[in-house]
């Protein structure tokens, strides 16, 4: 079943129907209730395995349904990052982030950092505040072991990972930024559900 060109799901306990884009119950006993969003990062298996070497993987199976078989992200055209702050959403289109991979932003009263990795073709989002201090981030010359550029904060010169939000060297080494709720999404799908939401670059 589709709603605004997006899949609907149902729960087995109440048979309520849910919209996966917004996490809201669309119909049924739980109509109007919202699920809690969890941050979702799309990254390469190499990046993930290096960060979490003990990761276990469920065996896959080939599907004969119309969904087909996922063969990896080959393009970012039409994609963006949906960032949710205090129940409000903002879209950061990947096309705009290609031109400006590090964005120091403020949205819904919160200082936000959005970082796009050209190599990984994905983005992450973090709070820029740390222990009462507001940090401003820039692209660093240094790279991680996978060739991805690292970040540098302008206040202490510490070097940060775009993927984990952790300071890997400098005065703030070991510190970690608070991860925001975000997930990659088709730009058109975001606009269909969040018609009045702000869009970075517009």
In which residue ranges do the predicted regions lie?
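Mid-to-C-terminal functional-domain signal that highlights helix-capping/loop sites
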Residues: 1-202
